[in-house]
Each structure stands twice: as structure tokens, then as C-alpha cells.
Amino acid sequence: MVARIIDGKAFASGVRGRVASAVAGLEAAHGVVPGLAVVLVGEDPASQVYVRNKGIQTREAGMASFEHKLPAETAQAELMALIERLNADPAVHGILVQLPLPRHMDAEAVINAIDPKKDVDGFHVLNVGLLGTGQKAMVPCTPLGCLMLLRDTLGDLSGLNAVVVGRSNIVGKPMAQLLLNESCTVTIAHSRTRDLAGLCRTADILVAAVGRPRMIRGDWIKPGATVIDVGINRIEEAGRSRLVGDVDFDSAAPVAGAITPVPGGVGPMTIACLLANTLTACCRANGLPEPDFAEAGG
């Protein structure tokens, strides 16, 4: 048995296409254009690439893109003032502050200064609480993308055993909550978990989000399980640099029923879900029906 390869790149393209269609319809029917503001502080090379890609895809979807680039030495008060202006701007429906921030800034305070209704990253404490109580919330983009891929692959997730390896606020915890909201039986594993390999072998759904290259091997995986690899790790191998996930793909693929590759799996879903969240925020701000992007993107 060789696992079905879950093509996140193709699925994300479908989501972006549906977002673009909905944006065009929104403008034609109501004269409303969703707007996404992205704030970058400093000159982190990876962050610059992410921000550039977000701007390109935002504009391709027919949305307004507002990019604010501030020097690394910017005072936190100045950043807070910018966020306050964006909160008050009716043309801006989504606000994203690119992480990581410079060390002198309090990232938690900055994120919680964003209007929760415009918090398209889903990191504001109010959205975290709403998600945790099963209410309507802005959902973090990467876990939302993972859930879309799981629903497309498996259909109804209720009753399945899910193990999420990693307990970060950005991926692990919200992923576990989303799966719980889907009526899965969920276990969160972390660095102190005993017999991690044995626990992983109980999972019908295994989500790896630990940031350790190829940590999860094929003999950790239940035959036929669906494996979602969130990890993006750059390693040197055979004299060249390459990206690998948290799962050892070569040993996992013959065991799993379905698996996301790295690259081309979860990664493309993140920006697609950011666009979907921005559209959702725009619809909510204008009292309009929200498109449903929770199902298949193709």
C-alpha cells in the first residue's frame, strides 16, 4: 500500500479561486472590496518573502492590499498607533502583524491590540477563547488549512482518534480544538509525552507540528492513518539545501493511507486560508452572508 498524496498546492489553488469569485461577486452586488493590511517590522528575510507573497495573492484575489513596513527600531507605541488607525479604517477588514517581532516588542500585547473582528490570523485572545468554546471565531490559518485537507480526504471526522504532536499556540492547540469541535477523540503530545511512538500508532489522524526534521518515522504510524505534516525544516543533505517535514516521508508513505508532502502540502493552504478569513471578516463587517470555505477547495 502506498499512501494517497494530499496535494495541498492544488487544493489551495481551488480555495483561492473560490475566494476570488466571491470577492468579484461582493464588489458587483454590494460595491464592497475586502482589504487586508499586513504590517512588517524589521527586515527578517523569511518574513519579507512571506509578506511579498501575501501581497501578490491578495491582489490576485481582487482584494485591496495595504502593506506597512516599519524599521526594526520602531517603538512599540508607534506600532500600536498604526494598529489603532487600521482598526478604525473601514477599508481594512483584516490586519496581520508578521511574526516574529523585534525583541524589544511585546508580541502578545501587539496581537491583542488588533480588533478581534479584523484578527485574520486568529491569534487574539478573544478568538482563542471563542474557538475553545465552540463559537464563531477567526480561526488560525494553518490549522484551518489542515482541517480543510482532512475533511476533503476523510469526509466525516467524528469518532476518529487524532493525535496532534506539538502544543504551540499557533498550530498545535488550535488544531486540537478544531478536531475536538469535529467530534474527534484528541490527544496533544509534546516533549514530555511518554512513549510518543506508541501514542502516534493509535492515531487515525496524525498531525505533526513540532519543528523537528523527520522526527516521526513510518513505524510510528498506524497503517492506513491520515498524516498531516505541518513542519517546514530546511536541512543540508548531499551537499544541498532542501525542505523536509516533521515526518520522515519515505518511511511514512508506504504505511499511511494519506499524507501531505513537504513542500506542497500544508504550506500553500496557509495564505489561501488567510484570504478566506479576510473575505469572511469583510462579510461580517458588512452584515452579508459568509461564504463557506470549510469544505473542499477543488
UniProtKB/Swiss-Prot annotation:
Q: What EC number(s) would the UniProt record show?
A: 1.5.1.5, 3.5.4.9
CDD domains, per this entry?
Answer: NAD_bind_m-THF_DH_Cyclohyd
Gene expressing this chain: folD1
Q: Where does NADP(+) bind?
A: G166, R167, S168, S191, I232
Annotated keywords:
Amino-acid biosynthesis, Histidine biosynthesis, Hydrolase, Methionine biosynthesis, Multifunctional enzyme, NADP, One-carbon metabolism, Oxidoreductase, Purine biosynthesis
Q: Does the keyword Lyase apply?
A: no
Extract one GO molecular function annotation from the record. Answer: methylenetetrahydrofolate dehydrogenase (NADP+) activity
- Which Gene Ontology cellular-component terms appear in the entry? cytosol
Reactions it catalyzes: (6R)-5,10-methylene-5,6,7,8-tetrahydrofolate + NADP(+) = (6R)-5,10-methenyltetrahydrofolate + NADPH; (6R)-5,10-methenyltetrahydrofolate + H2O = (6R)-10-formyltetrahydrofolate + H(+)
Q: What does this protein do?
A: Catalyzes the oxidation of 5,10-methylenetetrahydrofolate to 5,10-methenyltetrahydrofolate and then the hydrolysis of 5,10-methenyltetrahydrofolate to 10-formyltetrahydrofolate.
The keyword NADP is annotated on this UniProt entry: yes
- Name under which the protein is recorded: Bifunctional protein FolD 1
Q: Pathway listed for it?
A: One-carbon metabolism; tetrahydrofolate interconversion
Can you name the source organism?
Paracoccus denitrificans (strain Pd 1222)
